[in-house]
Amino acid sequence: MLSKKLAIDHIPHLIKGKRVLMRVDFNVPIKEGKIKDLTRIQGALPSINYCLENGAESVVLMSHLGRPDGQRVEKHSLKPVLPAIEDLLKKKVQFLDDCVGSEVERECKSASKGKVILLENLRFHLAEEGKGVINGEKVKATKEDIAAFRKSLTSLGELYVNDGFGTAHRAHSSMVGVNVDTRAAGFLLKKELQYFSKILETPERPLTVVMGGAKVADKIQLIMKLLELADELIIGGGMAFTFNKVLDGSNIGKSLFDQEGAKIVPDIIKKAKERGVKIHLPVDAVAADKFEESAATQLVDLKTGAIPDGWMGLDIGPKTIEQNSRVILRAKTVFWNGPQGVFEMAPFSKGSLSMLDDIIKATQTGATSVAGGGDTVSLLGKVKGTTDKFSHVSTGGGASLELLQGKQLPGVVALSDRQ
């Protein structure tokens, strides 16, 4: 049970005078030495500040950045992140150019008076992920190297805080290998667990799930699991055309068709019927003659008409928007994963933007709304001022989807249980 795990605000009395080792997610986009999006760094601030306010001797921050595959790659150094952390924390932060080893251990052990230290990229070492690539060859870290790496990390703190939800589904050394007595979730991780446990364990009903994206096959496990939880399921985006073709035999022109996913559609419909879940598919679509913003478009009624050969469906139409709106506005819990159309192009963004508006309206009238998945989160990022109108926007694409599929997250399992 997610709610049984120890969190940082359960242990203020244990923080005083302790060296805190904190796993954060500073995997931020950097271009020409400049950070393009500060969201992840800002997200870690409440946990860092809480430790400092409660008298931590020091806070040592560790993170990965990019995929250096177990080698030191300068463009993946965390050093460019330092000025942003100092600016946001309004205090000096010491940067160490490694994350383990005798020199790092010495610096971290002697840090005092609320000092904050940022370690170099964890993934510069093979032992963080347990594998990597050297000279184009895939290599694995030895058991001895992994044990030594974890021992060195463990010595850097007396208390461990995990605030890196984005990699909690990976059994990496910084997630599962820090062997101290007290291992707690930071505020960011706690919030993620709170909202996902609400969906998984105690949802207010009706619970409506909105699925989008391209392929059915990619999300089959997720859809099957969500059919055990949901009352209503809205299917949109590219994957909807696979459902339309299989179920109605409709001509979908050059729209996305997922050959593998098509084989699974009857199983999804069967399970939905067994569980009494209402599935809502598009009844009309905006079709285009090419995959471009300047394409010619036409509205197609999917019940009576067909998408012409050579044309492709790139968004849901007004009748579907209306249908979805009714479903969303009666929901008490909404989980949104995947846009309704090609929202990056203005002529095909209406379906996704209407969905966004409806979920915000539902939230304002008391529903719990959770958004997850890269495309959905980037849509919210594009439309200013929408993120904070959701109950929760998840920071962990893969981690949140694995959690919803009923899988255990190694980074969460490794946390101490509440007494």
UniProtKB/Swiss-Prot annotation:
Positions in coiled-coil regions: none
Reactions that this protein is recorded to catalyse: (2R)-3-phosphoglycerate + ATP = (2R)-3-phospho-glyceroyl phosphate + ADP
GO cellular component, one term: cytosol
Broad EC category: transferase
Cofactors that this protein relies on: Mg(2+)
UniProt-annotated binding residues for ATP: 214, 219, 238, 313, 344, 375-376
This protein's record includes keyword ATP-binding: yes
Sequence positions that bind (2R)-3-phosphoglycerate: 24-27, 40, 63-64, 66-67, 122-123, 169-170
Enzyme Commission numbers on file: 2.7.2.3
Subunit structure: Monomer.
Sequence similarity: Belongs to the phosphoglycerate kinase family.
UniProt protein name: Phosphoglycerate kinase
Gene source species: Sterkiella nova (Ciliate)
